Curated annotation (Swiss-Prot):
EC number: 7.1.1.2
Enzyme class per UniProt: translocase
Bilayer topology annotation: Multi-pass membrane protein
Keywords: Electron transport, Membrane, Mitochondrion, Mitochondrion inner membrane, NAD, Respiratory chain, Translocase, Transmembrane, Transmembrane helix, Transport, Ubiquinone
Protein name (database record): NADH-ubiquinone oxidoreductase chain 1
HAMAP family cross-referenced by the UniProt entry: NDH1_NuoH (MF_01350)
Lineage of the species this protein comes from: Eukaryota, Metazoa, Echinodermata, Eleutherozoa, Asterozoa
Native organism: Patiria pectinifera (Starfish)
């Protein structure tokens, strides 16, 4: 019976994620179209609403090709691993019927997200292509570099909230969102999430003018669709995590279902639209600028904020209790 409940909860998580990914592909093309003074998809279905279904069907019926010199097992296992990690990450999101309940959910998120590096490296190496391998090396270096800053920011959030549980962090912002009290930290977090998800202007792993398409250049059909779904699922997830960590989660509506879900979805949708606005507005960075930003700017700033929070909490703990609270 427990396995049946686990299976049902997993399906209830996976299906909305896939639907959200399909909707995001349509919204992205529409938003970019209007920002570039064109209409975007408007042929398939009313107002182009069925365009994601047509795109998905097209990818599924395409032939799955493998380069003759590619490593067959790792070549096909890498997209499966990438998609699996992207979907498993959603299981720790605190909802009414969670798939798993972990006290150290934030640590689990950090650990699982770091595993995606192996799928990117495996796909680039197993393709036996120079473009794929260069894209994979870029992706690994970029992801590992920005994960350090993200980890330090998360430690600062943990110090403020007093726990590694996402639910504890969300409930600690019932009166004031962490974004207001630590806006510089939130700004660094937001830009780092752009780099972590390989989005513009940090999409150097898929630099069309340099390495064609990056680590997935040799993929087609179903395996390419797995990479595509995983990338967009990660975009939605990282913005949902930003809402829970910095924007108070379902605050100010509390835990009233389904109002809380609508509030969180609305906040995450606004952040996703910011992702799309950045893509439409800014050109791609050079690779040296990307690395300079994280190692020379964000890493010292994140570490400085963390040290400041530790010292501040130590000073506040050493102060005697005020007489007005006695």
């Amino acid at each position: 019976m427990d396995w049946f409940v686990f299976f049902v909860n997993s399906i209830l998580f996976i299906v909305p994620v896939l639907l959200a990914v399909a909707l995001l592909t349509l919204v992205e093309r529409k938003v970019l179209g209007y920002m570039q003074l064109r209409k975007g998809p408007n042929i398939v279905g009313p107002f182009g609403l069925l365009q994601p279904i047509a795109d998905g069907f097209k990818l599924l019926i395409k032939e799955t090709l493998k380069p003759s010199n590619a490593s067959p097992y790792l070549f096909f296992f890498s997209p499966v691993l990438f998609l699996g990690i992207a979907l498993v990450l959603w299981s720790v999101i605190p909802v009414k019927y969670s798939v798993v309940s972990v006290n150290l959910s934030l640590m689990l998120i950090i650990g699982l997200s770091s595993l995606s590096v192996y799928s990117l490296l495996g796909s680039g190496w197993s393709s036996n292509s120079n473009y794929s391998f260069l894209g994979a090396v870029r992706a690994v270096a970029q992801t590992v570099s920005y994960e350090i800053s993200l980890g330090l920011i998360l430690l600062g959030v943990v110090l403020f909230a007093g726990g590694f549980n996402v639910e504890v962090i969300e409930s600690s912002q019932s009166w004031s969102w962490l974004m207001f009290s630590c806006f510089p930290l939130f700004a660094i977090w937001f830009v780092s999430t752009l780099a972590e998800t390989n989005r513009a202007p940090f999409d150097l792993t898929e630099g069309e003018s340099e390495i064609v398409s990056g680590y997935n250049v040799e993929y087609a059909g179903g395996p390419f669709a797995m990479f595509f779904i995983a990338e967009y699922a990660n975009i939605i997830f990282i913005n949902l995590l930003s809402v829970l960590l910095f924007l108070g989660g379902s605050s100010p509506m509390g835990e009233f279902f389904p109002v809380n879900v609508l509030v969180v979805s609305l906040k995450a949708g606004v952040l996703v639209l910011l992702f799309l606005w950045v893509r439409a507005s800014y050109p791609r960075f050079r690779y040296d600028q990307l690395m300079y930003l994280t190692w020379k700017k964000y890493l010292p700033l994140s570490l400085s904020f963390l040290v400041f929070f530790v010292v501040l909490l130590g000073v506040l703990d050493s102060l005697p209790p005020s007489s007005c609270f006695l």
